[in-house]
């Protein structure tokens, strides 16, 4: 398995730069290698841009190597200028501590840390007590300013109006020091990262060679970019987070369902652990009948399962089916809860009201599906209202046997306007009444 790992990464489009390919391949074939990937805790969650790196680490682990996942508590205090047009806001220590704890937990969902099969580290543990003079003597003297100025990220910032601070200019030295420390203490021989990190990776390789006289390796993958050219997961608009409290599993699932047909094969290869033969089969099937969206469904299901687990992936799939015209009657309780988290909702009538039959008209108004009782009656007369997927007529009442899994009744007006009656409302930050869910 190890001998073909590089070939598998290349087949997935996950090799952009690397140190000598033959030497790297030979080292991987010779035995287990410790390989590291780092994430700076600039937020309290990782995003899908980080997911590629974690999945590459997972591929190395599945091939018998040892991942070293680094949460950059030290480098996060400085900020990486790579791919940025302006200075980062510096975070305080308490915020960084909370962010590091959060992203460590997310890393543990992708990698197996049992019995030392993977290692989780924080670079603040070996950086916090290093004095400035020690750092300048043991790291700074091995790196020339010429080398630092040659890095694309530095050149781009120097050419900008804002320029670059000494803090961010020094970032590559801190990351190079990480590689040196990890090599000396954990035997790390390979660093991986996105192509925007290649300059930082090379700085670490050079430092290990100069200080320890050892040949170590680096590998980067091409950046996945959004239509506006920004890095996936790092756009200035709505990010797609791995934390379900920031991006619900349903919205995470829908992100992948909305992938452009032209990107399906590439995303299946990079954002899932499916074998490349299965990826190619799905891509070919999708190309023949893109309207079936088999590729997007496989992508959404696999990516959501990896990040949120099988139950959440299934609930997101069922919620999607409901919100795009499917019947909620056969859906599970988790799927209905997911739907209730995405659309307007109103309290379910009491048991006594349900026993007597609750008038649907005021419920449509309360749920935001009608502006008035008159509007609600007109919608019913026009046959535009459904209860649990079944079109209803004027005079319809909500009764106990309409309640799904003891908690939910799904209402729909027209094709896209949904609301849910919920037995115990309780959720804060609910969508505003009258919002719509648009199909991809």
What are these model-predicted stretches?
Residues 1-197, 202-205, 212-217, 230:
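NTP-dependent nucleotidyl-transfer catalytic core
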Residues 210-440:
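Conserved nucleotide- and phosphate/pyrophosphate-binding catalytic cores
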């Amino acid at each position: 398995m190890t001998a073909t790992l590089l070939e598998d990464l290349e087949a997935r489009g996950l090799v952009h730069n690397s140190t000598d390919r033959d030497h790297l391949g030979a080292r991987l074939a010779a035995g287990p290698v410790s390989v590291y990937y780092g994430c700076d805790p600039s937020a309290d969650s990782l995003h899908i841009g980080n997911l590629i790196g974690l999945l590459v680490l997972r591929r190395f682990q599945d091939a018998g190597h040892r991942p070293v996942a680094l949460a950059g508590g030290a480098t996060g205090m400085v900020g990486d200028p790579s791919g940025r047009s302006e200075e980062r806001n510096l975070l305080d220590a308490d915020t960084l501590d909370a962010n590091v704890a959060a992203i460590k937990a997310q890393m543990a969902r992708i990698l197996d840390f049992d019995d030392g099969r993977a290692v989780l580290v924080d670079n603040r543990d070996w950086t916090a007590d290093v004095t400035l003079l020690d750092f300048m003597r043991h790291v700074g003297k091995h790196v020339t300013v010429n080398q630092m100025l040659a890095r694309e990220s530095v050149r781009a910032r120097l050419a900008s109006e804002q320029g670059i601070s000494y803090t961010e200019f020094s970032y590559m030295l801190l990351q190079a020091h990480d590689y040196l420390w990890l090599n000396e203490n954990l035997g790390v021989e390979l660093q991986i990262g996105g192509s925007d990190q290649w300059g930082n990776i090379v700085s670490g390789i050079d430092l290990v060679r100069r200080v320890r006289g050892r040949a170590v390796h680096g590998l980067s993958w091409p950046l996945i970019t959004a239509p506006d050219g920004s890095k996936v997961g790092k756009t200035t608009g709505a990010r797609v987070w791995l934390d379900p409290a920031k991006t619900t599993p349903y919205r995470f699932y829908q992100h992948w369902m909305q992938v452009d047909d032209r990107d399906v094969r590439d995303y299946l290869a990079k954002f899932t652990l499916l074998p490349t033969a299965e990826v190619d089969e799905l891509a070919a099937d999708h190309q023949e009948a893109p309207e079936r969206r088999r590729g997007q469904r496989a992508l959404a299901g696999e990516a959501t399962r990896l990040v949120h687990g099988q139950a959440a992936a299934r609930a997101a799939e069922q919620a999607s089916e409901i919100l795009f015209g499917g019947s909620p009657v056969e859906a599970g309780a988790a799927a209905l809860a997911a739907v209730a988290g995405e659309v307007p909702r109103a309290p379910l009538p009491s048991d006594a009201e349900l026993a007597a039959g609750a008038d649907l008209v005021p419920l449509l108004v309360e749920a935001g599906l009608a502006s008035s009782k008159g509007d609600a009656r007109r919608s019913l007369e026009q046959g535009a209202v459904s209860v649990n997927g079944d079109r209803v007529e004027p005079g319809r009442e909500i009764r106990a046997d309409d309640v799904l899994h003891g908690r939910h009744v799904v209402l729909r007006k027209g094709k896209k306007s949904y609301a849910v009656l919920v037995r115990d409302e309780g959720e804060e930050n609910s969508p505003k009444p009258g919002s719509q869910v648009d199909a991809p």
